[in-house]
């Protein structure tokens, strides 16, 4: 179920202040963040965020196509190593 339109997008407050400081300073640094649930806003375009996936901060460069999505969508939390090999066929 989608979020109500009248509520507006959810963004943690500290993200807005951090993004503002980086824009004012003109630096192109990675903004470390743990809020995977926050929505990507148009003012974040061009910035790079380090989205925490439970292990490390994954760098995510924000483009216009990402606006409206959540940060967590671009930092996968699970690694797939493939299915285990068949032990019976290995013995022979």
Swiss-Prot record:
Q: Any idea which UniProt keywords this protein has?
A: Ribonucleoprotein, Ribosomal protein, RNA-binding, rRNA-binding
Which GO cellular component term is one of those annotated? cytoplasm
Entries under SUPFAM superfamilies matching the protein = Ribosomal protein S19 (SSF54570)
- Residue spans crossing the bilayer: none
Instruction: Please give the Pfam families that the UniProt record associates with this protein.
Output: Ribosomal_S19 (PF00203)
Q: Might you name a Gene Ontology BP term for this protein?
A: translation
Q: Where is the signal peptide?
A: none
Q: Which PROSITE patterns match?
A: RIBOSOMAL_S19
Q: Name one GO molecular function term.
A: structural constituent of ribosome
Spell out the InterPro entries in the cross-references: Ribosomal_uS19, Ribosomal_uS19_bac-type, Ribosomal_uS19_CS, Ribosomal_uS19_SF
General function of this protein: Protein S19 forms a complex with S13 that binds strongly to the 16S ribosomal RNA.
Family assignment?
A: Belongs to the universal ribosomal protein uS19 family.
Under what name is this protein listed?
Answer: Small ribosomal subunit protein uS19
Source organism: Brucella anthropi (strain ATCC 49188 / DSM 6882 / CCUG 24695 / JCM 21032 / LMG 3331 / NBRC 15819 / NCTC 12168 / Alc 37)
Gene for this chain: rpsS
């Amino acid at each position: 179920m989608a979020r109500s339109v009248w509520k507006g997008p959810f963004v943690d407050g500290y993200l807005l202040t951090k993004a503002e400081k980086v824009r004012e300073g003109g630096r192109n640094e990675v903004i470390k963040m743990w809020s995977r649930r926050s929505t990507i806003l148009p003012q974040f375009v061009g910035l790079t965020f380090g989205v925490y996936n439970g292990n490390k901060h994954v760098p995510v460069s924000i483009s216009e196509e990402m606006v409206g999505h959540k940060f967590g969508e671009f930092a996968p939390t699970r690694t797939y190593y493939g299915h285990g090999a068949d032990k019976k066929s290995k013995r022979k």
